[in-house]
Amino acid sequence: MVTNNIEEYKGVYVFAQQVDNEISGIALELLGKGKELAAKLETEVTAVLIGYNVKNLADKLAEYGADKVILVDDPELETYRTEPYAHALASVIEKYKPEIVLVGATAIGRDLGPTVSARVQTGLTADCTVLEIGDFPLVAIPGQEQKHNQLLMTRPAFGGNTIATIACPDNRPQMATVRPGVMQKIAPIAGAKAVIEEYNHGFTPNNKYVTIKEVVKAVSDTVDIMDAKILVSGGRGVGSAENFKILEDLAEVLGGTVSCSRAVVDNGWKPKDLQVGQTGKTVRPQIYFAIGISGAIQHVAGMEESDLIVAINKDETAPIFDVADYGIVGDLNKVVPALTEQLKAAKAEKAAN
């Protein structure tokens, strides 16, 4: 589908990802951002709900900002598979002509988004950290038309070492994927209702359809760092994988979870799913300990909205202190164990009383 008349494309659409009849958090976050973008464009937010027997989820989408829900419900959509889901979303785009389409940068979204963008012949910017409406080019260039009300999609590039702002001025829809935790949900409006429109273009299984023989769900006994209320995060300054034991001891006393910077993952000390930052996860815990972390902008972007930030670093000029609410300049190998012991003693005293 080549865009012939851009003016025909209206509205902000959000792919409302659901798994096992439960709306994913990223869908609610994107509805919040979609509401903001739609207000600037003076249009509506539409959630595209794809699955089987999922109509009951529409009210929740309305509570989090959807003005309208387009429901594509079919037995072929019971479990995510690339071809039927791509067919469903592409068919919606071709019929309704949205100006903007937002998809979560989840395992599903990273597969679905680019497949659909190729199918409808438009561009897609992946793993965005900022979405806003503005002019493009950002600065007027003599002799070149500056287009207004464009979706400006900002994302880290070159391994997070630079930030790129990208637009898609000549094609519609403008498509972006966004990492979970980057955008914020709106406060739910209890009892809100959305207009529901059911649409099914039909499904004809072909050689692109895979057959799912069995679904094996991973079981984890660890807390997702995006859900943790207290994070004890370590950086290169921790020194080694073994030395993370002192951070784990502190986290245990606090009832928190250990996380880390990209340098730690690059060194093989901790797995990728514990990484905080632009190329990791965006977190907003109640308390964030930044231990042995210098405070590179890429890391700060992933944790600066924490309620309380405590930084421990031997370098008093480390940028992390610029965003910290409390800072301790000192050797983490001495400071952290001492802090852990003090907290243990305080807990024991409280328990005794």
Place the predicted regions along the sequence by residue.
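N-terminal glycine-rich FAD/FM-binding segment characteristic of electron-transfer flavoproteins
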Residues: 1-353
